[in-house]
Protein backbone atom coordinates (compact mmCIF):
# COMPACT_ATOMS: atom_id res chain seq x y z
CA UNK A 1 0.00 0.00 0.00
CA UNK A 2 1.32 3.47 -0.83
CA UNK A 3 1.98 5.69 2.22
CA UNK A 4 -0.90 8.16 1.72
CA UNK A 5 -3.40 5.74 0.16
CA UNK A 6 -6.91 5.84 1.53
CA UNK A 7 -8.66 3.90 -1.20
CA UNK A 8 -8.07 0.58 -2.95
CA UNK A 9 -9.02 1.77 -6.42
CA UNK A 10 -9.47 5.37 -7.54
CA UNK A 11 -10.78 6.55 -10.90
CA UNK A 12 -10.20 9.88 -12.62
CA UNK A 13 -11.14 10.85 -16.14
CA UNK A 14 -10.82 13.70 -18.57
CA UNK A 15 -9.73 14.91 -21.95
CA UNK A 16 -6.30 15.93 -20.60
CA UNK A 17 -5.69 18.21 -23.57
CA UNK A 18 -2.44 20.15 -23.26
CA UNK A 19 -1.73 18.55 -19.89
CA UNK A 20 -1.58 21.56 -17.57
CA UNK A 21 -1.22 22.26 -13.83
CA UNK A 22 -4.92 21.63 -13.19
CA UNK A 23 -4.70 18.18 -14.77
CA UNK A 24 -1.47 17.47 -12.92
CA UNK A 25 -3.10 18.37 -9.60
CA UNK A 26 -6.10 16.11 -10.34
CA UNK A 27 -3.84 13.21 -11.32
CA UNK A 28 -1.49 13.77 -8.38
CA UNK A 29 -4.33 13.60 -5.86
CA UNK A 30 -5.66 10.42 -7.47
CA UNK A 31 -2.17 8.89 -7.26
CA UNK A 32 -1.81 9.96 -3.62
CA UNK A 33 -5.17 8.51 -2.60
CA UNK A 34 -5.26 5.21 -4.45
CA UNK A 35 -3.45 1.91 -4.22
CA UNK A 36 -4.51 1.50 -7.85
CA UNK A 37 -5.66 4.24 -10.20
CA UNK A 38 -7.70 4.02 -13.39
CA UNK A 39 -7.23 7.06 -15.62
CA UNK A 40 -9.80 7.46 -18.37
CA UNK A 41 -8.75 9.60 -21.34
CA UNK A 42 -11.51 10.71 -23.72
CA UNK A 43 -11.28 9.24 -27.20
CA UNK A 44 -11.21 11.40 -30.30
CA UNK A 45 -14.76 10.33 -31.17
CA UNK A 46 -16.04 11.32 -27.71
CA UNK A 47 -14.24 14.67 -28.01
CA UNK A 48 -16.02 15.25 -31.33
CA UNK A 49 -19.39 14.29 -29.78
CA UNK A 50 -18.77 16.87 -27.06
CA UNK A 51 -18.17 19.51 -29.74
CA UNK A 52 -14.63 20.35 -28.62
CA UNK A 53 -12.37 21.81 -31.31
CA UNK A 54 -8.59 21.90 -31.57
CA UNK A 55 -7.99 19.09 -29.07
CA UNK A 56 -4.75 17.13 -29.35
CA UNK A 57 -5.10 13.60 -30.77
CA UNK A 58 -5.94 10.78 -28.33
CA UNK A 59 -2.53 9.09 -28.56
CA UNK A 60 -0.73 12.36 -27.85
CA UNK A 61 -2.89 12.99 -24.76
CA UNK A 62 -2.34 9.42 -23.54
CA UNK A 63 1.43 9.84 -23.99
CA UNK A 64 1.38 13.02 -21.90
CA UNK A 65 -0.60 11.33 -19.12
CA UNK A 66 1.67 8.25 -19.22
CA UNK A 67 4.77 10.46 -19.06
CA UNK A 68 3.35 12.30 -16.02
CA UNK A 69 2.53 9.00 -14.28
CA UNK A 70 6.04 7.71 -15.02
CA UNK A 71 7.59 10.88 -13.59
CA UNK A 72 5.60 10.22 -10.41
CA UNK A 73 6.95 6.65 -10.29
CA UNK A 74 3.44 5.20 -10.35
CA UNK A 75 3.30 3.27 -13.64
CA UNK A 76 3.01 -0.08 -11.89
CA UNK A 77 -0.30 0.83 -10.24
CA UNK A 78 -1.99 2.84 -13.00
CA UNK A 79 -4.20 1.70 -15.84
CA UNK A 80 -4.92 4.21 -18.62
CA UNK A 81 -8.14 3.41 -20.47
CA UNK A 82 -10.04 5.02 -23.37
CA UNK A 83 -13.08 6.98 -22.23
CA UNK A 84 -15.89 6.58 -24.78
CA UNK A 85 -18.58 8.28 -22.67
CA UNK A 86 -19.12 10.19 -19.40
CA UNK A 87 -19.05 7.05 -17.26
CA UNK A 88 -16.20 4.93 -18.56
CA UNK A 89 -15.87 1.76 -16.49
CA UNK A 90 -17.39 3.28 -13.33
CA UNK A 91 -20.70 1.49 -13.90
CA UNK A 92 -19.06 -1.91 -14.42
CA UNK A 93 -16.24 -2.03 -11.87
CA UNK A 94 -17.41 -2.83 -8.35
CA UNK A 95 -13.83 -2.60 -7.01
CA UNK A 96 -13.66 1.17 -7.51
CA UNK A 97 -14.21 3.04 -4.29
CA UNK A 98 -13.37 6.68 -5.09
CA UNK A 99 -13.50 9.18 -7.93
CA UNK A 100 -11.41 12.36 -8.18
CA UNK A 101 -13.11 15.26 -9.97
CA UNK A 102 -13.00 19.02 -10.47
CA UNK A 103 -15.93 21.25 -9.46
CA UNK A 104 -16.87 21.22 -13.16
CA UNK A 105 -17.24 17.42 -13.29
CA UNK A 106 -18.68 16.85 -9.82
CA UNK A 107 -22.25 16.61 -11.22
CA UNK A 108 -21.12 13.69 -13.40
CA UNK A 109 -19.73 11.93 -10.30
CA UNK A 110 -23.09 12.38 -8.56
CA UNK A 111 -24.82 10.93 -11.63
CA UNK A 112 -22.38 8.00 -11.65
CA UNK A 113 -23.20 7.25 -8.02
CA UNK A 114 -26.93 7.26 -8.72
CA UNK A 115 -26.43 4.84 -11.62
CA UNK A 116 -24.12 2.64 -9.50
CA UNK A 117 -26.77 2.43 -6.78
CA UNK A 118 -29.37 1.33 -9.35
CA UNK A 119 -26.98 -1.43 -10.47
CA UNK A 120 -26.36 -2.59 -6.90
CA UNK A 121 -22.82 -1.19 -6.68
CA UNK A 122 -21.67 0.86 -3.71
CA UNK A 123 -21.36 4.60 -4.37
CA UNK A 124 -17.91 6.07 -4.93
CA UNK A 125 -16.39 8.50 -2.47
CA UNK A 126 -16.22 11.78 -4.38
CA UNK A 127 -13.05 13.82 -3.94
CA UNK A 128 -13.44 17.32 -5.41
CA UNK A 129 -10.21 19.14 -6.24
CA UNK A 130 -10.48 22.94 -6.52
CA UNK A 131 -9.53 24.56 -9.80
CA UNK A 132 -5.91 25.68 -10.17
CA UNK A 133 -5.78 29.42 -10.85
CA UNK A 134 -3.25 31.36 -12.88
CA UNK A 135 -1.47 34.51 -11.73
CA UNK A 136 -4.51 36.60 -12.67
CA UNK A 137 -6.84 34.43 -10.58
CA UNK A 138 -8.41 32.79 -13.64
CA UNK A 139 -9.02 29.05 -13.87
CA UNK A 140 -6.35 27.27 -15.88
CA UNK A 141 -8.16 25.36 -18.61
CA UNK A 142 -7.39 23.56 -21.84
CA UNK A 143 -9.94 25.65 -23.73
CA UNK A 144 -8.19 28.84 -22.64
CA UNK A 145 -4.83 27.34 -23.57
CA UNK A 146 -6.19 26.32 -26.98
CA UNK A 147 -7.44 29.87 -27.52
CA UNK A 148 -4.12 31.36 -26.52
CA UNK A 149 -2.25 28.96 -28.79
CA UNK A 150 -4.64 29.65 -31.69
CA UNK A 151 -4.41 33.40 -31.30
CA UNK A 152 -0.82 33.46 -30.13
CA UNK A 153 0.79 36.24 -28.20
CA UNK A 154 0.80 39.59 -29.96
CA UNK A 155 4.23 41.16 -30.16
CA UNK A 156 5.52 44.20 -31.94
CA UNK A 157 9.13 43.44 -32.81
Curated annotation (Swiss-Prot):
Any one GO BP annotation for this protein: coenzyme A biosynthetic process
Q: Which UniProt keywords apply?
A: ATP-binding, Coenzyme A biosynthesis, Cytoplasm, Nucleotide-binding, Nucleotidyltransferase, Transferase
- A Pfam family assignment: CTP_transf_like
The reaction(s) annotated as catalysed by this protein in its Swiss-Prot or TrEMBL entry are: (R)-4'-phosphopantetheine + ATP + H(+) = 3'-dephospho-CoA + diphosphate
**Molecular function in Gene Ontology:** ATP binding; pantetheine-phosphate adenylyltransferase activity
InterPro entries attached to this UniProt entry: Archaeal_FAD_synthase, Cyt_trans-like, PPAT_arch, Rossmann-like_a/b/a_fold
Subcellular location(s) per record: Cytoplasm
Q: What is its EC number?
A: 2.7.7.3
The reply on keyword Cytoplasm is: yes
Gene Ontology CC terms: cytoplasm
Entry's HAMAP family?
PPAT_arch
Task: State the similarity comment.
Answer: Belongs to the eukaryotic CoaD family.
Q: What does this protein do?
A: Reversibly transfers an adenylyl group from ATP to 4'-phosphopantetheine, yielding dephospho-CoA (dPCoA) and pyrophosphate.
User: Matching NCBIfam families, A to Z?
Assistant: cyt_tran_rel (TIGR00125), PRK00777.1 (NF001985)
What's this protein's name? Phosphopantetheine adenylyltransferase
Q: What is the lineage of its organism?
A: Archaea, Methanobacteriati, Methanobacteriota, Methanomada group, Methanopyri
